[in-house]
A protein has these predicted regions:
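A helix-boundary/hinge signal
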Residues: 1-217
Length: 217
């Protein structure tokens, strides 16, 4: 009882110091001067802090900011896959759009039969084993790979996951009937070629060559 009373008195003292404003409340984003949220301000805050150390490479890879944010959401496992929608009381089917299993982030990007074929094609093209978990994908997966190669691979992984997500959404929202794994690869390599414009000329050529090699598997 004594501790509760002390806690209550402490709370009362804290509340007495609060000055209530007569103005209506409003949302204010503290990372911008005008108080309005922007992705850029969030991005700069993240890369200059240690909030997500295991996914720091995502913020440094040469892809559009939108893709970096998407990859960060994948890492945090908060993109709106059907299991996450169900947590928001969504009542739709929980089945994966590519197969008959329940959809979650790990299944969609790693365990789905379609995903396994895609990762197998990467293994054949570049002799890199598939990560076994989302944490591994953003953590130790590329340990031991030289930095230049790892940098290019990360661009490819961004393209792969973004292509899978786009194809999944085509099935869900655009009523596409089916998706062949080659469609996903071609879409991913198209993203790589487009994003290669963000890199210096020499690195751009290596990215384009790698994407062509992937298509030929």
């Amino acid at each position: 009882v004594g501790n509760r009373w002390e806690a209550w008195l402490h709370l009362v003292r804290r509340l007495m110091d609060v000055q209530l404003s007569q103005q209506p409340d409003q949302l204010y984003w503290k990372l911008t001067k005008n108080g309005v949220f922007s992705v850029k301000s969030m991005y700069l805050d993240v890369i200059n802090s240690s909030v997500v150390p295991s996914s720091i490479h995502v913020w440094r890879v040469k892809v559009p900011l939108r893709i970096k944010v998407f990859m960060w959401f994948v890492h945090k496992q908060v993109i709106l896959t059907k299991d996450n929608l169900a947590k928001r009381n969504w009542m739709g089917s929980s089945r994966c759009s590519f197969c008959d299993h329940n959809e979650n982030i790990k299944h969609l990007f790693l365990d789905c039969p379609l995903a396994k074929i895609l990762w197998r094609s990467i293994h054949i093209a570049f002799n890199i084993n598939q990560p076994t978990s989302i944490n591994m994908l953003f953590g130790t997966w590329l340990d031991g790979v030289d930095s230049d190669t790892a940098r290019h691979i990360r661009v490819g992984v961004c393209a792969l996951l973004w292509a899978v997500w786009n194809c999944r959404n085509d099935l869900v929202f655009n009523r596409s009937t089916n998706i062949h794994f080659l469609q996903v690869i071609f879409r991913a390599t198209a993203f790589i070629r487009m994003w290669s414009l963000l890199t210096p000329t020499e690195a751009r050529e290596r990215l384009v060559t790698a994407s062509t090699r992937w298509e030929m598997v």
